[in-house]
């Protein structure tokens, strides 16, 4: 049975839990999606989602709750991890605009700009092209970070807004600028969870 954990310290956790449950159903896979708060919940975990929210807060709480090092280790060992918005920042190797005390998992060879799109008023929705699906995907961007550079050959673009890369994959790791959990479309979650089944 698949066990998916959504890091539930801050951010849009419930939306990811619902999206992951629907995605597993659509894939015909039996599994459980849990609200991940403590390191002991990582036992037998199949995949992890790091939601949007505020990256400084998520970073601090992951360290405080003892999740930071075990999640980093699992990612390095090949466990599928997907980060959206602030989750992408948490996964990135280099972050422009980070605060000095912020720690990052550094599992994804990308450079991101932390608040590239500005304040809440600059949030928008636009169709995204996906590498793994012919139909456009409804991309919801909320004070999104921006992927400014791919730092290694291992990073593959999987989502585009026009000609700009807004989603990437590196082996077991997926990082997205946008919020797939805020739509009724589960294609991105299904693509990610196929790595775990």
From Swiss-Prot:
| Keyword line | Glutamine amidotransferase, Hydrolase, Lyase, Pyridoxal phosphate
Q: Which GO terms describe its biological process?
A: glutamine catabolic process; pyridoxal phosphate biosynthetic process; pyridoxine metabolic process
The UniProt subunit note reads as follows: In the presence of PdxS, forms a dodecamer of heterodimers. Only shows activity in the heterodimer.
| UniProt cross-references to PROSITE patterns, sorted A to Z | PDXT_SNO_1 (PS01236), PDXT_SNO_2 (PS51130)
Q: Where does L-glutamine bind?
A: 53-55, 114, 142-143
Entry EC number(s): 4.3.3.6, 3.5.1.2
Name of the featured protein: Pyridoxal 5'-phosphate synthase subunit PdxT
Membership in a protein family: Belongs to the glutaminase PdxT/SNO family.
Which InterPro entries does the entry mention? Class_I_gatase-like, PdxT/SNO, PdxT/SNO_CS
Record bears the keyword Lyase: yes
The source's domain of life comes to: Archaea
Please describe what this protein does: Catalyzes the hydrolysis of glutamine to glutamate and ammonia as part of the biosynthesis of pyridoxal 5'-phosphate. The resulting ammonia molecule is channeled to the active site of PdxS.
In its UniProt record, a GO molecular function of this protein is:
pyridoxal 5'-phosphate synthase (glutamine hydrolysing) activity
Signal peptide boundaries: none
Q: Which source organism?
A: Thermococcus kodakarensis (strain ATCC BAA-918 / JCM 12380 / KOD1)
Q: Which Gene3D superfamilies match?
A: 3.40.50.880
Q: List the taxonomic lineage.
A: Archaea, Methanobacteriati, Methanobacteriota, Thermococci, Thermococcales
Query: Which residues carry out catalysis?
Result: 85, 179, 181
Which CDD domains is this protein grouped with?
GATase1_PB
